[in-house]
């Protein structure tokens, strides 16, 4: 799978995803740092990448402004430790692979699909 990580996410996730056979790129490394959110979402859409972010503003772009996307994984994790993040992503990739083209909200105990 192809992923784009927002600049606010832990940079170690690129290596973590790559070691699992995925193609992962990150804003701030592979693309300029500080891109506006709408440009980040447009890059992901253009390149067919699933966006991984912890920035809730992407929900507004998708649902309020109807910006197209190829999937968003919104990490809504209070303690944002790397171990928790990777454990939750492992669950998402294993249990929700058929829903990765949607807007998924990932919390410590749940994965839900956000709709309008």
Regions found by a protein language model. Give the residues of each.
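Intrinsically disordered, low-complexity and often Lys/Arg-enriched segments
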Residues: 1, 115-116
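Acidic, metal-binding active-site segment of PIN/NYN-like and related structure-specific nucleases
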Residues: 45-62
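Small/polar loops that bind or transfer phosphate-bearing groups
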Residues: 5-6, 53-54, 77
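Short, flexible helix/strand-to-coil boundary loops that buttress conserved ligand/catalytic motifs
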Residues: 17, 62-65
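C-terminal structural segments of small proteins and small subunits
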Residues: 70-112
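N-terminal first-folded block
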Residues: 2-50
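Short, hinge-like loop/turn segments at secondary-structure boundaries
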Residues: 42-44, 68-71
